[in-house]
């Protein structure tokens, strides 16, 4: 209705329909079987960029500050190492190409060299027409005698397959793959759901606003996902069904039913995850 009404008052060739920008996601609350699972609060700066994410999970609270300089996003905060929190430091660095993440460096502290910060994992992202297609990886670890580091090129570790504007397969090469199914329900532009490199798609990373920097997003919302080992694709290890609550133009709720199957000695398990979304960052209106 909005588009029709605006079209009636547009008179010149230069007039374009104005579609108000949707508010940005500012809070995510998730429960697992009725108990707190995680909570995330997101703030933005005056340029509508992520400024801070406070994530509370498993009784621990992590405050990450996002520092954007040119084409680099540095994330400063605390990490958990062996169950204990570190001192705050820049633990993740993203490098942008255009408006897309081209590389991600995960930092660690070298306990053999006075906690010197080093790059433990570097991910490099490959896109085709702005679709994320694959991720290659380099890992590094310190020598225990403090003499330096060892490095290993892992090559391509993640692969994404797209059909009809949606990721239908994510593969962790070469062993595992997860398949996603969709219906016609569209993903709102401000709902940052993304197929991430996980075979348990229930965490904050799959709906973090940072996902909007990984090129084109899914056109639709998934209804089901299931993963399996490539060598035994008929044995589904776990499956997930998705339901959504839509209020106006906003996804305000999501339910994920998790069914873990007794495959390869794993104990069967059923879980229900309930998500609530709040959008309190009002985009600038004309």
Region locations from a protein language model:
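C-terminal motif of bacterial Sec signal peptides marking the signal peptidase cleavage site
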Residues: 7-10
